[in-house]
Swiss-Prot record:
TM segment ranges: none
InterPro entries per UniProt: AP_endonuc_2, AP_endonuc_F2_Zn_BS, Xyl_isomerase-like_sf, Xyl_isomerase-like_TIM-brl
The protein's name: Probable endonuclease 4
Cofactor binding mode and count: Binds 3 Zn(2+) ions.
Organism expressing this protein natively: Thermotoga petrophila (strain ATCC BAA-488 / DSM 13995 / JCM 10881 / RKU-1)
Listed cofactors: Zn(2+)
Gene Ontology MF term list: deoxyribonuclease IV (phage-T4-induced) activity; DNA binding; DNA-(apurinic or apyrimidinic site) endonuclease activity; phosphoric diester hydrolase activity; zinc ion binding
Length: 287
């Protein structure tokens, strides 16, 4: 069974997310644990978490298919000490929110070194992750491959491996693969040999069991453009035929697919429908 959903709004409360997910045709989702553009975050009340967990059960969403995404302001690679420290403290709070909600996975962008260099940026990311992981429990941090722009660290998978290799609690660090970011950085998933190479690289660097989520996004720009502009499924340079190749791999089908395509719930419902149309159109076998 395909596990699919979208990044969902929390404006109506955490407890609305499971129902809204099912309403758009999903059985998986991603949310922000707080206002993504704020340094402020607070733990949800016991009443809120009780309602949320009840709705998760009511709508039959598996906890392995529930994800949080860290806020936009966090930058663990920042050479600015005040920003780095605020990032560490906010990430700790996000982990605590996830743990209270019962969500096991928290996705993060590793960060941008802002010109200080990849080596220094990587060291700061590792130091920050160690501080967060050593002061929290249970929640697994997912390192996402990012776009190849600015001082971003993590646009190549071996950069994510360097981070994970240096972290103390490796069992609490796994990865997310974003199809737009990868395409943007030169990973061509529109061809069978490209997907095979990607899967082989993930297996070699991390083990495929460490791939916990796929951000399913088309790309507004061509392969290797380093622009980072998500597009609706089938409407970008990956396209229907490209996604058909990607979807045909059993290893890909085992991982939850989360849409971060332009638009809201209505557009995401259409994109989920489009995914299944591609599967049917290209006669893709699904377990």
């Amino acid at each position: 069974m395909i596990k699919i959903g979208a990044h969902m709004p929390i404006s109506k409360g955490f407890d609305r997310v499971p129902q809204d997910t099912v309403n758009i045709g999903g059985n998986a989702y991603q949310i922000f644990p707080h206002n993504a553009r704020s340094w402020s975050a607070k733990l949800p009340s016991d009443d809120i978490t009780t309602k949320f967990k009840r709705e998760m059960k009511k709508y039959g969403i598996d906890w392995e298919n529930a994800f949080c995404h860290s806020g936009y302001l966090i930058n663990l690679a920042s050479p600015k000490e005040d920003i780095w420290q605020k990032s560490v403290e906010l990430l700790k709070k996000e982990v605590e929110i996830c743990r209270k909600l019962g969500i096991r996975y928290l996705n993060i962008h590793p960060g941008s070194h802002l010109g200080a260099g990849e080596k220094e940026g990587t060291e700061r990311i590792v130091r920050g992750l160690n501080e967060v992981l050593n002061s929290t429990e249970d929640v697994v941090i997912l390192l996402e491959n990012v776009s190849q722009k600015g001082g971003n660290i993590g646009y190549k998978l071996d950069q994510l491996k360097k981070i994970r290799d240096l972290v103390d609690q490796k069992d609490r660090v796994a990865i997310t693969y974003d199809t737009c970011h990868g395409f943007d950085s030169g990973y061509d998933i529109t061809k069978k040999e490209g997907v095979e190479a990607l899967l082989n690289e993930i297996e070699t660097l991390f083990g495929l069991e460490r791939l916990k989520m796929i951000h399913l996004n088309d790309s507004k720009y061509p392969l290797g453009a380093a622009k980072d502009r998500h597009e609706r499924i089938g409407s970008g340079f990956i396209g229907e035929e490209g996604f058909a190749v990607f979807f045909s791999f059993k290893e890909i089908q085992k991982v939850p697919w989360i849409l971060e395509t332009p638009g809201g719930n209505e557009e995401h419902a259409e994109d989920i429908k489009k995914v299944f149309e591609i599967i049917e159109k290209f006669d893709i076998e699904v377990d």
